[in-house]
UniProtKB/Swiss-Prot annotation:
One of its GO terms (biological process) is translation. The keyword Ribonucleoprotein applies. Its cofactor is Zn(2+). Zn(2+) binds at residues 16, 18, 37, 40. The lineage of its organism: Bacteria, Pseudomonadati, Pseudomonadota, Gammaproteobacteria, Enterobacterales. Belongs to the bacterial ribosomal protein bL31 family. Type A subfamily. PANTHER family: 50S RIBOSOMAL PROTEIN L31, CHLOROPLASTIC, LARGE RIBOSOMAL SUBUNIT PROTEIN BL31A. It holds the Pfam family Ribosomal_L31. Keywords: Metal-binding, Ribonucleoprotein, Ribosomal protein, RNA-binding, rRNA-binding, Zinc. Binds 1 zinc ion per subunit. This is Large ribosomal subunit protein bL31. Binds the 23S rRNA. It comes from Buchnera aphidicola subsp. Acyrthosiphon pisum (strain APS).
Length: 72
């Protein structure tokens, strides 16, 4: 087997825009700036919004004039 062909792992810091700092190991040799992390993402903080997909379906049916009889 060849020696020294694997990339070298180094410890870097990933800094989020909310101020959270995460230390990780990576093959890149520079620090990262993140837009969003688990501490500020709406899914993890419980502040997520519900998207109204029912309105889109009704608009599609209206546009193409589908009725319940045609769909069955």
């Amino acid at each position: 087997m060849k020696k020294k062909i694997h990339p070298r792992y180094s410890k870097i810091t990933a800094t989020c825009s909310c101020g959270n700092i995460i230390e990780i190991f990576s093959t890149i040799n520079h620090n990262l700036n993140l837009d969003i992390c688990a501490k500020c993402h709406p899914f993890y903080t419980g502040k997520q919004r519900v998207i109204d997909t029912g309105g889109r379906v009704e608009r599609f049916k209206k546009r193409f004039k589908f009725t319940k009889q045609e769909l069955n």
